[in-house]
UniProtKB/Swiss-Prot annotation:
Catalyzed reactions per annotation: 1-(2-carboxyphenylamino)-1-deoxy-D-ribulose 5-phosphate + H(+) = (1S,2R)-1-C-(indol-3-yl)glycerol 3-phosphate + CO2 + H2O
EC identifiers of the protein: 4.1.1.48
Matches recorded under Pfam families: IGPS (PF00218)
Swiss-Prot/TrEMBL keywords: Amino-acid biosynthesis, Aromatic amino acid biosynthesis, Decarboxylase, Lyase, Tryptophan biosynthesis
Protein's name in the database: Indole-3-glycerol phosphate synthase
Any one GO molecular-function label of the UniProt entry: phosphoribosylanthranilate isomerase activity
Cited InterPro entries: Aldolase_TIM, Indole-3-glycerol_P_synth, Indole-3-glycerol_P_synth_dom, Indole-3-GlycerolPSynthase_CS, RibuloseP-bd_barrel
Family stated for the protein in its record: Belongs to the TrpC family.
Organism: Cereibacter sphaeroides (strain KD131 / KCTC 12085) (Rhodobacter sphaeroides)
Enzyme class: lyase
One GO BP: L-tryptophan biosynthetic process
């Protein structure tokens, strides 16, 4: 039986083929070269994590498991609210079929703020990496559950070529071991199982202590309160990717500020 991730991969490969036919790689690369310089996604997170938390605040309209998350969806306004609330970076969904995202959302968000931006999508082809840079992305996502080791290496090399950072996402010990062969410093631990979309913070609790010390941990999904962040900070997570719990709030700026309140000091640990 196919999983949600299987279904996403199937339509995404069709989408990539259609985009390549519509817009040749050379045109995408020309746009990538003309894009504003990358803003330093990993550097911003590292700086923030040294004294508090690094927050990747996500602009997400919907998801396969929850359906529509936010009806009032003004991308520039949301980006500015996140920035004013203290977010370090932004994550912007560009996948349409499952998340009601769009490429233009990334452009709008980046133009509205000074924060580095992640293109949140399912990447399988280096064409998409050039596309991400053309859209203004400062970082891409590599989901280890969805790619082979050789694909991951190719995507990472392409990101490096364009001056972008890479957030390498894992959900299991096996995926973490594979991720360690990549050069990227950012390790995203997704508390959501992408096969079932079930969420458990135990995933970060288990994997964080196994991440090499030279990597920066980003805990993703299922984060709702300052206590959640403090809990996982004790296991070594200093950065967090939060979307749904902030997107559902009427006052996104206040909600962002509230979840970042009273960060656990870097001396905390288990």
């Amino acid at each position: 039986m196919s999983t949600i991730l299987d279904r996403i991969k199937a339509y995404k490969l069709e989408e990539i083929a259609a985009r390549k036919a519509e817009r040749p790689l050379v045109a995408v690369e020309d746009a990538a070269r003309a894009a504003p310089a990358p803003r330093g996604f990993a550097r911003a997170l590292s700086t923030a994590a040294a004294t508090g938390y690094g927050l990747i605040a996500e602009i997400k309209k919907a998801s396969p498991s929850k359906g529509l998350i936010r009806e009032d969806f003004d991308v520039p306004a949301l980006a500015r609210a996140y920035e004013a609330g203290g977010a370090t970076c932004l994550s912007v969904l560009t996948d349409g079929p499952s998340f009601q995202g769009a490429d233009d959302f990334l452009r709008q968000a980046r133009e509205a703020v000074k924060l580095p931006c992640l293109r949140k999508d399912f990447l399988y082809d280096t064409y998409q990496v050039a596309e991400a840079r053309a859209l203004g992305a400062d970082c891409i996502l590599i989901i280890m559950a969805s790619v082979t080791d050789s694909q991951a290496l190719e995507l990472e090399a392409a990101a490096s070529h364009w001056g972008m950072d890479v957030l390498v996402e894992v959900h299991s010990r096996d995926e973490l071991a594979r991720a360690e062969h990549l050069k990227s410093r950012l390790i995203g631990i997704n508390n959501r199982n992408l096969d079932t979309f079930e969420v458990s913070l135990d995933v970060t609790r288990d994997l964080a202590r196994r991440v090499p010390e030279d990597r920066l941990i980003v805990s993703e999904s299922g984060l709702y309160t300052p206590e959640d962040l403090a809990d996982l900070a004790r296991y070594g997570a200093r950065c967090f990717l939060i979307g749904e719990s902030l997107m559902r709030q009427a006052d996104v700026e206040a909600a962002t500020r509230a979840i970042l309140a009273d960060p656990l000091t870097s001396q905390g640990g288990v």
